[in-house]
């Protein structure tokens, strides 16, 4: 929710996570083709807003505001009992089911702590490869 304009690269289809609980969480996250238009529309709805994701009034989304105002009501409407973290778990599962390389999955979700030394030192993926992977789900 803390995506500032300078950390979002819509033309290249990714955003930079620059604040995380762990060093491994700092990464480039691909934006799937399916949702790119939503990111663009949200951004264009308030070009002067500092943050990509914002309230209708152009204010920064706090997690609790987002969860209570958007996520929870949507889950209730759909009859689904899930948290935002469940979405992360589902993403990992869908990527694995799609046959995506485990190292790419770890890069996307920031699990580099679970990487082997070889994966950390010798494997590098450009953002196009990460976008291609996320587009398979």
Give residue spans per PLM region.
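Catalytic-site neighborhood detector that most strongly recognizes the C-terminal catalytic loop/helix
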Residues: 19-23, 109-136
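Short, basic (Lys/Arg/His-rich) helix/loop patches that form interaction surfaces
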Residues: 29, 43-52, 57-61, 68-115
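Generic alpha-helical segment signature
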Residues: 63-64, 130
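Short, charged phosphate-coordinating catalytic segments
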Residues: 1-12, 103-104
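Basic, alpha-helical nucleic-acid-contacting "clamp/cap" segments
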Residues: 9-56, 73, 77, 129, ...
């Amino acid at each position: 929710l803390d995506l500032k304009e300078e950390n979002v690269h819509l033309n290249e289809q990714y955003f930079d996570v620059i604040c995380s609980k762990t060093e491994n969480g700092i990464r480039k996250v691909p934006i799937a083709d399916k949702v790119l238009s939503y990111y663009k529309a949200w951004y264009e709805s308030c070009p002067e807003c500092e943050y990509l994701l914002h309230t209708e009034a152009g204010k920064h989304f706090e997690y609790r505001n987002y969860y209570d105002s958007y996520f929870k009501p949507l889950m209730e409407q759909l009859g689904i009992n899930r948290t935002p973290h469940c979405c992360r778990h589902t993403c990992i599962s869908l990527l694995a089911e799609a046959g995506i390389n485990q190292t790419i999955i770890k890069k996307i979700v920031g699990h580099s702590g679970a990487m082997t030394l070889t994966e950390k030192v010798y494997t590098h993926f450009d953002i196009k490869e990460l976008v291609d992977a996320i587009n398979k789900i």
